[in-house]
Amino acid sequence: MDTVVVKKWLDRYPKLENFMDAGTISLKMAREILDVDRYFMYDMFKEFITAGAVTASGTNSWRATKELKDYLKQRREQAKNGN
């Protein structure tokens, strides 16, 4: 997984970290939470796919890969410990 791409989007949209690994996420729900338009959300989705962070689940939703889940867990632990 390309963590540079994931970190770029997590830094830009901190709310992503709250729901990225919550199961199957629809593009519509993600764009409503992030308050972005559908084309921007689709471009973000394509970057996540090519980075190996998510897998497509149908045509309009995604699921986090194991690598992304582990990465988010690590980030949360570091934030909790103040690193």
Model-predicted segments: where are they?
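Short amphipathic alpha-helical interface segments
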Residues: 2-32
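Short, cationic-aromatic polyanion-contact patches
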Residues: 3-10, 59-80
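Short amphipathic alpha-helical interaction segments
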Residues: 36-47
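A short, conserved structural fragment
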Residues: 49-59
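Short stretches within intrinsically disordered, low-complexity N-terminal or propeptide regions
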Residues: 24, 32, 53-55, 66, ...
